[in-house]
């Protein structure tokens, strides 16, 4: 069809672009590049094709680690940003390129621009507000965490100075939190101005102690690497994963960083690489992991990261698989938060998604029932790894997995928290 369109009009840039997307689907990157190049040559204001070229060069780099492809990817995104400086996806992808090149400072700068866009760009802000106000569960989850966190900060337990919130704002939060308890809060009770305030980070001071390795090297790393590489499927559990100092720093950061603005229906809130975690601490942490466990990560690089903070009266993340080669999942809640030391961690099944499944078939809340039926019908083995403070699980990210059932103390400082980083 697209070939026919191109024969009729060789300058049909959309036909060239769509042809490129078809080649991407079958992993024919050279032909995809040619099609996207043709599209851009037909109309050099059609930046989508230049962006796709940058993405394809990234994928080619991840296949063969040829630095030339990484450099070409960088050139594509820089060209786009010259014409469209606030293009979020180009800023994000360029930030990954800079991280993969080892330039943490520039990667941080780019990611912070993206994060700022999340709460300052009016169109993006309006979409997020509409999404939350239209879903009572999301609204309750966001307000409950915000109120608990600001109460914690206001009590000055962690000596956080100059919090940027007023008594009026805090009193409104308190009133809404009380209404959540009796299930009487509705989306139309909340003003747009209040939502703009709640979605703006009030405090986000990252840990500064990053000169030393953040990963504990006083354990048998070579033995851990051997276990990971010898076991099928690839799963290894590491206790005492972070250094003591790094653990305390990240615990304090997660208690106080006002970045958890992405609520989920089941009661947990999230922050992501481009949405709050855009700082040198996490970028350095990802590099320290990769370099310390070189025989696990090999040449794989960070592609995404998030932190989830759970409501201890609700459930965790449902069964899914992630689109990456390696998943790093570690837990930072203190051991005395967990009321059942044999649970609360991670369940992993020895099964990858069928090759004909789309991403949404294995990575969406709505797909959980289908996945469970599939795993039961196949009688797939699973392992359960209990929660423990400073315990890390590294595994093949494409394996189906979910949060184990958990029973934690019901207070803010005892919330179950997991940090996830994906490498590809």
Where are these regions (language model features)?
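Fe(II)/2-oxoglutarate oxygenase catalytic core
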Residues: 100-102, 107-108, 112-392, 398-424
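Helix-start (N-cap) detector for alpha-helical repeat units in TPR-like alpha-solenoids
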Residues: 13-14, 47-48, 88-89
